[in-house]
């Protein structure tokens, strides 16, 4: 076909004629074409929805799906909808009651540390810390999240997405005699926000009078609980939310300020920490003022300082990925800073002096008090004592009062500083997974406290004795004194509503696209009409496989990349193993005839004496007959030893061998290396060793490190040109790193005593290069070739690449087996053109024909070598 768009699903009518689906009319329809003619005919004329699932019967009858129906079509006739009426008993239930003992996704600790609230499959629960008694607070098919306890412990605030809109809700103990949610008999819920804008991630102010929340995902707003008046604290233009839950802010102890992440103008990849006045007067202070990434600030030392994470000291990202972080502290108070820097000895002396002074003052004060003082005045004194004084900040010198707390940079999780400021507890990955580490800031010692803790937000109790966290669906309590860990058990009654839950996920996905799709006009589609068109199928869907298909079809109407839904059911009980060989498909006798043995596969051991041409006659004692389905013989044998009976026709000998079978992913890895080795060998042979070759497998850090290592190695750095192969790359985020690596211009040489030992820049490719690309380059594998061409680094060779350069968020649902994607960050060139749906054309267009691929011919690679030889010759002149 020749349509400059999408054609798919061809089916043969006869040896010359075929049918296929084409979007040439604006919607997928059935087209007819033949090998003997360049003409094609549109057979169906459907609009609004695409034709899908084209197939053909032996008698030439076409069958396809359209708008939820099945149609048939005979040559010369009109499409006929197949009337289907299925009579069946309803065996699936609308409500399934379960007891859940795991699956918690986030937690909030009550102020008295007697109970913990958590989210389980989108509902709010509270459980006792001593017993597994659990109270369900919400029971909806929709989703609740972002829980927080009020300072008095009598209310819980959370966000809930009901009727397609996230709003803030509060559940409160209605009976004044009841103190705990776990055992409460009367809990009342009220909706706090009444806006038409997305509102979630609420947090109580420490005085309990107000609740802060995010509106439209990045604007910080505050609602006064008494008056219900709402004010804006920080405009949303100063932050950007890529995925829900990625924002962070925290109230100050005096309820007057908020610490938050801050991008300012254009600082998406260089975040700072900002101090924001909670009154809504617009006062914002960028505290960190750094080109590095500074995030996740927490108030410490009663508001006199903050700790936060920064990647300024650790290993830098090598290929846009992999930067390591550290925990830092910034002081807003000189006295607190000087106290923090004291040695253990000096601090002990100071504390003794302070203790003596306090005792003296209390003694003097006691003499002046009336011994018959009534309870009312006593309560007044207590209230005055508990009153939090307004914080005062010395911000002018804050950058001179920064201390790095962690000794070793690493990938970090959460971190907590003790109330005295003498120890830091943090999650880090020094030894594989996330562990809990203790940094003694006075002794300058680091020790492992809890192995295999996992990664998650840690909550410290008021006494500072324990931390609570949720990881892997379980709630844990850890003593920071000795690292002992206690699971917090719960028994949550969960009402699973499969139909209601799928309806919620459908509406949620529709709304997420409306709110977050990278273009506000959603590519001009009538998104409202598509919701109605697809939602009508929900009552007939009783499983997630069909639901995922329907959701994907609706998302496919967006005409955008990175859309669609995925369903991840529980894996098969037994996975089928592989033997790492190609079989001779033309062989018709008993057994499996080996055509090729994959390098580094199970048979790639010399002592086995198994070569191409040998026949596998038996697998674990079972003979393989001609045409037999042998795959069941390998079920459940990944990583296990398999006993094989081998016959070698060349020698007439039979032998018994034992190999360790491999998984499909392991075999795919061997096939990939085989393909790369073949390409590298081909380039060496075609260029006589003058041209280097490298393949960029993915747009990620491991791939970048491979590319960097190979092209700057002694083997390749002295070659005259480079072929950068990006074919079949599925994307990631590496465009600028690769473009920078390949755009080096030599500006000086290092020559000690007449010997050339290197050039500057030494960390870039300095010679001609080209980029190979093909039809299935995707996402950032479209973005990098585009950047390469835009910066005029070299030529693109291969086939046109569809415009798919957007950044996606694949969101896992409350049913974690369902995931869907939203392309939400568009990339716009300096001419104002979005790269999405903007095809990238090569400078030299070359197609690899299927018949060439079957015999190992790669016309694209040949063209690249030819072009690089020209460039190498030109560079010599």
Map each language-model feature to its residues.
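A flexible loop/linker signature enriched in serine peptidases of the S9 family
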Residues: 1-8, 19-31, 37, 45-52, ...
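Conserved blade-ending motifs and adjacent loop-strand segments that build the rim/top face
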Residues: 6, 41-55, 285-298, 406-413, ...
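Blade-terminus and WD-like Trp-Asp/Gly-His loop motifs, strongest in beta-propeller folds
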Residues: 10-17, 54-60, 107-114, 147-155, ...
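A short helix->beta-strand "capping" segment at the edge of beta-propeller domains
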Residues: 87-104, 185-191, 391-409
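Terminal targeting/pro-maturation regions of precursor/exported proteins
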Residues: 317, 481-484, 489-553, 557-558, ...
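Extended, small/polar residue-biased N-terminal targeting/export presequences
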Residues: 539-590, 652-678, 859, 865-877
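PDZ/PDZ-like domain segments forming the peptide/carboxylate-binding groove
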Residues: 574-627, 825-826
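Cleft-lining beta-strand/loop regions that shape enzyme active-site pockets
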Residues: 595, 602, 617, 622-623, ...
């Amino acid at each position: 076909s020749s349509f400059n768009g999408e054609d798919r699903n061809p089916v043969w009518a006869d040896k010359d004629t075929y049918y296929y689906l084409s979007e040439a009319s604006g919607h997928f329809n059935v087209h007819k074409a033949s090998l003997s003619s360049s003409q094609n005919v549109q057979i169906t004329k459907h609009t609004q929805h695409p034709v899908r699932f084209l197939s053909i019967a032996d008698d030439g009858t076409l069958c396809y799906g359209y708008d939820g129906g099945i149609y048939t079509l005979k040559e010369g006739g009109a499409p006929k909808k197949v009337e289907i009426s299925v009579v069946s008993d309803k065996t699936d239930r609308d409500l399934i009651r379960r007891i859940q003992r795991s699956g918690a996704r986030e937690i909030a600790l009550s102020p008295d540390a007697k109970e913990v609230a958590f989210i389980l499959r989108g509902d709010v629960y509270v459980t006792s810390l001593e017993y597994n008694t659990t109270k369900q607070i919400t029971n909806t098919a929709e989703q609740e999240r972002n829980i927080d306890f009020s300072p008095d412990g009598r209310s819980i605030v959370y966000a809930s997405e009901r009727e397609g809109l996230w709003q803030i809700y509060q559940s409160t103990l209605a009976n004044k005699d009841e103190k705990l949610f776990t055992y409460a008999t009367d809990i009342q819920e009220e909706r706090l926000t009444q806006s038409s804008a997305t509102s979630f991630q609420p947090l109580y102010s420490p005085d309990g009078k107000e609740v802060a929340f995010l509106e439209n995902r990045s604007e910080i707003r505050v609602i006064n609980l008494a008056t219900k008046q709402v004010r804006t604290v920080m405009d949303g233009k100063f932050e950007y939310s890529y995925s829900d839950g990625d924002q962070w802010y925290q109230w100050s102890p005096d309820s007057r300020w908020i610490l938050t992440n801050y991008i300012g103008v254009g600082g998406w990849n260089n975040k700072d920490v900002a101090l924001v006045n909670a009154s809504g007067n617009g006062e914002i202070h960028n505290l960190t003022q750094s080109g590095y990434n500074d995030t996740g600030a927490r108030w410490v030392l009663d508001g006199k300082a903050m700790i936060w994470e920064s990647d300024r000291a650790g290993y830098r990202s090598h290929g846009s990925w992999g930067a390591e972080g550290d925990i830092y502290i910034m002081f807003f108070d000189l006295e607190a800073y000087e106290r923090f820097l004291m040695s253990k000895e000096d601090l002990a002396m100071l504390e003794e002096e302070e203790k003596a002074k306090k005792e003296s003052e209390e003694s003097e004060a006691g003499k002046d008090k009336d011994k018959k003082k009534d309870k009312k005045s006593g309560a007044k004194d207590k209230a005055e004592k508990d009153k939090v004084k307004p914080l005062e900040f010395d911000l002018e010198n804050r950058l001179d009062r920064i201390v790095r707390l962690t000794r070793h940079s690493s990938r970090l999780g959460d971190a907590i500083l003790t109330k005295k400021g003498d120890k830091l507890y943090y999650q880090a990955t020094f030894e594989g997974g996330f562990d809990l580490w203790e940094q003694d800031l006075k002794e300058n010692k680091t020790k492992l406290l809890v192995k295999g803790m996992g990664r998650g937000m840690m909550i410290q109790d008021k006494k500072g004795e324990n931390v609570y966290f949720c990881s892997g669906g379980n709630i844990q309590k850890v003593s920071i004194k000795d690292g002992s860990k206690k699971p917090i058990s719960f028994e949550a009654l969960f009402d699973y509503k499969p139909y209601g839950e799928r309806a919620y996920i459908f509406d949620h996905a529709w709304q997420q696209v409306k709110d977050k799709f990278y273009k506000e006009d959603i590519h001009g589609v009538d998104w409202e009409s598509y919701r109605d068109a697809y939602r009508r199928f929900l009552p007939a869907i009783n499983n997630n496989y069909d639901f995922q298909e329907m959701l994907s079809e609706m998302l496919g109407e967006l005409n955008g990349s990175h859309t669609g839904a995925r369903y991840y059911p529980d894996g098969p009980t037994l996975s089928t193993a592989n033997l790492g060989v190609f079989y001779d498909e033309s062989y018709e006798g008993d057994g499996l005839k080996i055509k090729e043995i994959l390098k580094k596969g199970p048979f790639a051991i010399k002592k086995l004496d198994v070569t191409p041409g040998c026949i596998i006659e038996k697998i674990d004692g079972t003979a393989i007959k001609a045409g037999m389905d042998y795959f069941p013989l390998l079920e459940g044998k990944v990583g296990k030893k398999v006993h094989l009976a081998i016959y070698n026709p060349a020698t007439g000998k039979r032998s018994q061998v034992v190999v360790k079978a491999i998984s499909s992913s392991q075999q795919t890895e061997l096939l990939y290396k085989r393909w790369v080795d073949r390409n590298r060998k081909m380039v060496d042979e075609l260029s006589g060793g003058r041209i280097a070759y490298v393949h960029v497998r993915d747009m990620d850090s491991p791939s970048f490190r491979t590319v960097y290592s190979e092209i700057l190695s002694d083997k390749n750095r002295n070659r005259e040109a480079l072929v950068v192969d990006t074919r079949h790359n599925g994307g990631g985020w590496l465009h600028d790193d690769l473009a920078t690596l390949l755009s080096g211009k030599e500006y000086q040489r290092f020559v000690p005593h007449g010997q050339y030992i290197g050039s500057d820049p030494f960390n870039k490719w300095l010679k001609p290069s080209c980029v190979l690309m093909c039809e299935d380059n995707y996402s950032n594998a479209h973005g990098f070739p585009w950047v390469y061409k835009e910066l005029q680094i070299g030529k693109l060779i291969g086939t046109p690449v569809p415009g798919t350069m957007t950044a996606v968020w694949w969101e896992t649902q409350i049913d974690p087996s369902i995931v869907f994607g939203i392309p939400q960050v568009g990339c716009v060139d300096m001419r104002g053109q979005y790269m999405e749906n903007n095809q990238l054309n090569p400078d030299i267009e070359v197609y690899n024909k299927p018949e060439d691929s079957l015999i190992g011919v790669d016309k694209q690679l040949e063209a690249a070598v030819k072009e690089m030889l020209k460039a190498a010759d030109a560079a010599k002149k």
